Amino acid sequence: MIKMTDLLLDEHYAQHKGKHFLPRLKDFMKLLPVVLVVLEGLEVARVVRAMCGPTDGKNAPPGTIRGDFGMSISNNIIHSSEDLESAKKEIGIFFKTDELFNYERADLQFYYAEDEREN
């Protein structure tokens, strides 16, 4: 869990620099601490985005995180990376290399067939 700073948010939202909504978004992101997680798995970005639902909580279906707990497009309850490339960039912004660990999960064989497992 961390408290967001302007420095972190400027780096994370660099593609939105100068857009009218950015100051309000940054203020919202700094209100409370946030929980950061790195997930892994087959097609993890696609799967997590499906679990989150559409960005606008009002239009997200029940059973998704945004559909069950979100009501706003700007005061968003959750963020998920668009794809693996975005995830790698975001992980680099928010995590130090010594905070991440490579390991082989003992239960991997129960989730994926051998030919489906990512290396």
Briefly describe each language-model feature range.
Residues 1-119:
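Non-catalytic terminal and connector segments of soluble metabolic enzymes
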